[in-house]
């Protein structure tokens, strides 16, 4: 998709989706890195989407699904809402039934499994099921890159962890496009 058209479409949907996600995460007192409102992280994920989404987005209708995925990808896991809540929120935001289902499937696919450790939560089942949902692996890459950039910026111990995990993460995520995003992740 043309980059300019993608960004114009993204801007059409971003404000309302962002506001709804902010309310959801704020309602459970969720923060990013202890002191930042959680919307800080979600904006960073949407920023990666803005950089690379045009390379994978197939239709104009898919743009709002991707924006929704960027802003709601952690909502089931962290904001105490269910898959059905996600469907309803997408509907309230004007999504068609099919768009609502696709948006909810992305969010669900990015919801970690139950587990005591990071490895338990991001297990084979998690990646296998994620790869079945259109755009879910791409959205996970946006999330991972946003987290990594923040770890570098703040000199967090997670920087080392993300670097160590990256080769296995890229193998398990199972995508090679968009090439620029994959190159950035591979270079970490």
Outline where the language-model segments fall:
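Active-site helical microenvironments for divalent-metal-assisted chemistry
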Residues: 1-188
């Amino acid at each position: 998709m043309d980059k300019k058209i993608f960004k114009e479409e993204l801007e059409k949907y971003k404000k309302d989706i962002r506001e709804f996600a902010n309310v959801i995460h704020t309602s459970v007192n969720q923060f990013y890195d202890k002191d930042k409102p959680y919307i800080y992280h979600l904006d960073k994920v949407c920023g990666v989407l803005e950089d690379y989404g045009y390379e994978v987005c197939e239709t104009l209708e898919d743009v709002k699904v991707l924006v929704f995925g960027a802003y709601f990808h952690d909502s089931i896991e962290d904001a105490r809402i269910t898959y059905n809540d996600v469907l309803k929120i997408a509907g309230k935001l004007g999504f068609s039934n099919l768009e609502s289902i696709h948006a909810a499937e992305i969010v669900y696919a990015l919801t970690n499994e139950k587990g005591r450790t990071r490895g338990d939560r991001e297990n084979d089942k998690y990646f296998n099921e994620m790869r079945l949902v259109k755009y879910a692996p791409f959205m996970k890459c946006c999330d991972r890159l946003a987290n990594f950039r923040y770890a570098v910026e703040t000199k967090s111990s997670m920087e080392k962890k993300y670097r160590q995990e990256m080769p296995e993460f890229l193998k398990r995520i199972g995508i090679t496009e968009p090439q620029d995003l994959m190159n950035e992740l591979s270079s970490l």
